[in-house]
């Protein structure tokens, strides 16, 4: 996928993004408070993201991806492999 745009975030199914944020956080063994501290947001905001009550901005999704070892595309595209972590390029 080419550079992720704000449009791609708006086009992606909100429930997919929410479920993958929760999955990534849990598989990275992070609490809501822990992830919030890393990405600079509140526990309450993360709960809203994980319950599909709010669509994340590109900047926030990028921070969550970095904190959990995922690619931004993994959160947006149902066809991207849902394996726990992206493999490092050799």
Functional labels for PLM-detected ranges:
Residues 19-38, 63:
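Short basic helix-loop element that most often maps to the first helix and adjoining turn
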Residues 53-66, 82-84:
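Short, basic-rich loop-to-helix N-cap that marks the start of a DNA-contacting helix
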């Amino acid at each position: 996928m080419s550079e992720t745009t704000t449009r791609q975030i708006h086009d992606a199914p909100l429930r997919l993004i929410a479920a993958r944020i929760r999955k990534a956080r849990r598989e990275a063994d992070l609490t809501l408070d822990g992830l919030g501290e890393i990405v600079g947001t509140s526990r309450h905001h993360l709960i809203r993201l994980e319950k599909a009550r709010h669509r994340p901005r590109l900047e926030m999704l990028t921070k969550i991806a970095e904190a959990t070892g995922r690619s931004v595309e993994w959160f947006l595209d149902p066809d991207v492999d849902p394996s726990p972590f992206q493999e490092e390029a050799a």
